[in-house]
Amino acid sequence: MSIRRILVTGGAGFIGSHLCDRLIEDDVELLVIDNYYTGSLSNVSHLTDNKKFKIINHDVSDPFDTEVDEIFNLACPASPVHYQKDPVRTTKTSVQGAINMLELANRVGARILQASTSEVYGDPEVHPQTESYWGRVNPTGPRACYDEGKRCAETLFFDFYRQYLLEIKVARIFNTYGPKMNINDGRVISNIIVQALKGINITIYGDGKQSRSFCYISDMVDGLIGLMKTKKEIIGPVNLGNTNETTILELANMVIELTRSKSRISFVPLPEDDPTQRCPDTRLANKILDWQPKVSLEDGLIKTINYYRSVL
């Protein structure tokens, strides 16, 4: 029986590197392409001596050719700090990157999974968000480069499925956190933890009453691998995330308590188009993947705090 060859785009990033850690445990050959725009070689440096692992510096928006059995398409900056820095590049990564990987998958007969996002729901009017909800996204706002880029990538995946009968899987990833998030990541959990550990004011946008649900990285990786392994007929989209909702202010107070920080909270204006609520309906994932998150927010925060202590 031949060894499975797996390609992970964005494999040096936060979620991608954790996915690689899990995949390499099986009898596979693992190829990663990453341009290190937000990813870092240090995230996978412990794998580079493994003969089953190879990483190539490559931008997914440029064509790429190889022979693989499976593709996890994760490449794209996911934090507003990064994706708004070069919005044209962000859109190109999502759209042209999807086209390149879909054409590769179609050419070699590979199964391909798209790492989509809860951002396709925008600032939702339906709560919690089900996969059948079409979303409420501002197509011309400062977040559109990411939100609409991911929505277009989903469109391309389903068009390749309908037109070429390509084996696709689409996962909609909700807020995910854990070790290996960059200290300058810019997202809420990394911001709050880093500020708390430094003892500086913790920045809260708006009044802090906006809510999110946070999924620990190991649970997310379980979901992604589980979805890739499902039978051909299951294509998605499938929500992956934690259904336990918390406000940003509650999160900040929890981090202050866990870090024993003397930081105070500083309220600043809410960014444009920032969602007021974000929480997944995961009944579909529960049913078809037999999946649900196992790590509580407190336990996940403790692990993440310990990681940041080690790198600050």
For each of these PLM feature ranges, what is it?
Residues 39, 85, 93-96, 144, ...:
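Residue-level signal for the nucleotide or nucleotide-sugar donor/cofactor binding architecture
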Residues 69, 81, 88, 99, ...:
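Residues in well-ordered alpha-helical elements
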Residues 1-176, 196, 218, 303, ...:
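N-terminal Rossmann-like NAD(P)+-binding domain of SDR-like oxidoreductases, especially those catalyzing
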Residues 217, 237, 269-292, 303:
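Conserved C-terminal active-site "lid" loop/helix of NAD(P)H-dependent oxidoreductases
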Residues 19, 224-228, 252-255, 301-308:
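Hydrophobic "lid"/C-terminal helical patch
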Residues 125, 151, 167, 176-191, ...:
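Glycine/proline-rich active-site loop of Rossmann-fold NAD(P)-dependent oxidoreductases
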Residues 53, 131-137, 164, 193-204, ...:
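A short C-terminal helix-loop "cap" of Rossmann-like NAD(P)-dependent dehydrogenase/epimerase domains
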